[in-house]
């Protein structure tokens, strides 16, 4: 059962209004969404309920919601073609989350790598190890030092879990609700979020098998180039808005001259050859990816252009490319008023709510509460 405006494939994605959105968010996600608008019915959300899984300053959060919506618009997301809305404006998101919480299992969520990263816990793995060792040792009834070590690890892990917020643990279920509410066909995400879309698929299928066909099961779409733009100060880690050093990322609202300085300070690899090789030359490969995606120049062409030249020349040119991109982007950004954004979010919420409420009604009928 689909909404009448939904003849085209439905694409859903969103960005949290927390921290500074950066070049990695733009190249890895938003620029891809812009291209998807032509052939798809796109729904883009400012996921403010996801942002509050960690502490936010209320006044800053308010500003960031508007800022993210402006970034969508300045990037080329067109409210005439796409639905843009604020997650918290539609209560169906949290209602469906509760229903899906009753279908989800703790083990589904313990597997999520983002939870493991943020709490430094891989509880599933430790429990499996303890069980294996205990079974192996049970005949002799001697508890080995290995088991003792694992039990200590288990206690530390449980201590970390007790301190972590429930929202941080459960937000993949909220993400599943975001996606399933809109009969979504495709979810464009970065590699780090692909696992959460897999959970969404699992929960959708589990609900369908328990209560009958209800949800459309979406596909994951990961951009090949630029899916992961790495940190300028450390190419082994993803560019991140919560990085300790400001030299890790280029913010979309950074002054162009500041961004150029960050490029000039970016780490490089040993040797002098400007060549794309993720394993041997991760730093220069990351900079080449940024260059290629911002200019649409193929990687091979860039390699040929800088054959025999040094890192200094290459970084100088890339700094200019980034400067030009940010200057143009920020010019568009500054032209958008807060009032305009509020109106677009309000209109978007009205359109999104019709679809979300229809899905939620179907779900409530299936589980027997209406």
Language-model features, listed with the residues they occupy:
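Short helix-capping/linker segments at secondary-structure and domain boundaries
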Residues: 41, 106-110, 181-188, 292-302
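Short amphipathic alpha-helical segments at helix-loop
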Residues: 53, 181, 185-188, 333, ...
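Conserved nucleotide- and phosphate/pyrophosphate-binding catalytic cores
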Residues: 23, 194-195, 201-370
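Structured ligand/cofactor/substrate-binding pocket environments in proteins
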Residues: 21-30, 41-43, 47, 57-64, ...
């Amino acid at each position: 059962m689909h909404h009448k405006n939904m003849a085209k494939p439905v694409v859903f994605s969103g960005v949290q209004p927390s921290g500074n959105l950066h070049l990695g968010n733009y190249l890895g996600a938003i620029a891809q969404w812009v291209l998807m608008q032509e052939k798809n019915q796109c729904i883009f959300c400012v996921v403010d309920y996801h942002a509050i899984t960690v502490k936010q300053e209320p006044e800053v959060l308010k500003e960031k919601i508007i800022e993210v919506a402006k970034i969508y618009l300045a990037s080329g997301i067109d409210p005439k073609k796409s639905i843009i809305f604020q997650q918290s404006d539609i209560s169906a998101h949290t209602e469906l989350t509760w229903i899906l919480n009753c279908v989800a299992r703790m083990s589904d969520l313990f597997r999520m790598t983002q939870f493991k990263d943020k709490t430094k816990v891989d509880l599933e793995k430790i429990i499996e190890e303890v069980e294996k060792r205990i079974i192996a040792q049970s005949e002799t009834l001697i508890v080995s030092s290995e088991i003792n070590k694992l039990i200590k690890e288990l206690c530390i892990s449980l201590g970390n879990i007790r301190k972590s917020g429930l929202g941080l643990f459960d937000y993949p279920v909220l993400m599943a609700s975001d996606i399933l509410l809109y009969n979504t066909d495709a979810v464009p995400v970065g590699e780090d979020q692909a696992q959460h879309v897999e959970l969404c698929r699992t929960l959708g299928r589990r609900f369908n098998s328990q209560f009958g066909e209800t949800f459309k099961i979406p596909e994951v779409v990961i951009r090949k180039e630029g899916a992961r733009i790495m940190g300028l100060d450390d190419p082994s880690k993803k560019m991140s808005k919560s990085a300790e050093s400001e030299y890790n990322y280029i913010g979309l609202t950074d002054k162009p001259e500041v961004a150029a300085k960050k490029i000039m300070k970016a780490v490089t690899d040993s040797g002098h050859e400007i060549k794309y090789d993720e394993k041997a030359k991760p730093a220069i490969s990351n900079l080449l990816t940024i260059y290629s995606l911002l200019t649409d120049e193929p990687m091979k062409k860039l390699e040929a252009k800088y054959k025999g030249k040094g890192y200094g020349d290459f970084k100088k040119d890339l700094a200019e490319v980034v400067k030009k991109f940010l200057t143009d982007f920020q010019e568009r950004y500054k032209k958008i008023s807060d009032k305009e954004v509020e109106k677009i979010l309000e209109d978007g919420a009205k359109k999104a709510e019709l679809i979300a409420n229809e899905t939620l009604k179907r779900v409530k009928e299936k589980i027997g509460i209406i």
